Amino acid sequence: MSLIQIISMIVFLFSVFLIFWAMLGYDISLRIINKIRGKAKTEHTEYKYSVTVMIVAHNEEDVIYDKLVNVIDNNYPKDKIKYLVASDNSTDQTNAIVENFIKNHEDLDIKLYTSKNHRGKTNAQNEAQKSVDSEILVMTDANAMFKNDTVSELVSSFANDDIKYVCGALRYINTENMTADSESSYWDRELVSRSIESRIKTITAGNGAIYACRNSDYVTFPPIECHDSSMPYYYGMHGQRAIFNENAIAYEKAGENTEDEYKRKVRMNRVILLHIKNGMKAFNVFKHGWFSYFYFGHRTSRYLLWINHLLAFISNVILAVYSDLIFWKIILGAQILFYILGILGRKSKSKLLHMIYYYCITILAQWHGIFNCITGKAKPTWEKAESTR
């Protein structure tokens, strides 16, 4: 066996293992760990913290009224809760609708904060948070609808001082659509993993539609970053906890067409190189314990799918050319077939083919994110996906 074959085989096996670990291996390991450790009891507090619910919006005139009606219909003590709409320089009727709602609900503490410049969700949150004096800050999107007890559930999870962040469960309501169903299937599995991570120590990422943090521990991140990924990472690296409460529920529509879902995934990967760099910092199990294991398996290995698929393909081509073994040619054929099925899945009504297609556009979106990072095209703002409203 030549040197190039040996190197190619090592690269192939390593990249395939990381792909397997990202998509199946880590989740399997979590479930094994959970079985061995047993299900830990989740603690809750009865203490009623003062709360501000922040709704972040940019040109959300179609949903902001319904969101306000939804969020004020909660079972939290009225004297302990405030509402704040952080408008990211909305240019439609969003601000006017909110102002009119405030006039018609003078018995409630509702305020509107407007950013002078359109610099994205995180910037609007950073600016609006400066006016918050509550103990707990709940943050949510304009198109995510809460259950009546969602705020209470989020707040009840702050049972210990080391818990700085709580993420709720996002449920999709339009799973009859192929694209939405693919996202929902992935998300259901994701929530199981978060639940296990949370019980053991801490989660590695949240969800921008439904989460809360201690206001005193709010971190001002650069506008290009998002709280979903940055907050749990920050707290985890500082030995604090970000946890998941499956009973704090929000409902939302998933993207119903590939274009909307692809744009969302590209946006999610706008700082993918930073995430990979952060993963390297977290890769110290002696210092960070369980968080190090969780972050590598749940985040870093997934952030590396784009390069591992490329390495697996290139090394497989080399092995198929230089090796006499038919095995490598069969594996290469299987890889090519996989991508062909992914292309066919775009128009197919087959759930399996569409899942393969959905996976392929996820990898493509990572490449797009890498391109934007390198060329400086990554930006903190985006246009909302109309199919999610």
Regions found by a protein language model. Name each.
Residues 49-52, 82, 230:
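Cell-envelope/extracellular polymer assembly enzymes that use nucleotide-activated donors
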Residues 4-5, 32, 44-45, 252, ...:
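Membrane-embedded multi-pass helical conduit in multi-pass membrane proteins
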Residues 137:
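Short aromatic/hydrophobic "clamp" motif used to bind/position activated sugar donors
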Residues 113-114, 122-124, 134, 148-225, ...:
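Long helical/loop segments within the catalytic core of UDP-sugar-dependent glycosyltransferases
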Residues 69-80:
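Short, acidic, metal-binding catalytic loop of nucleotide-sugar glycosyltransferases
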Residues 1-45:
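N-terminal membrane-anchoring/stem segments of glycan-assembly enzymes
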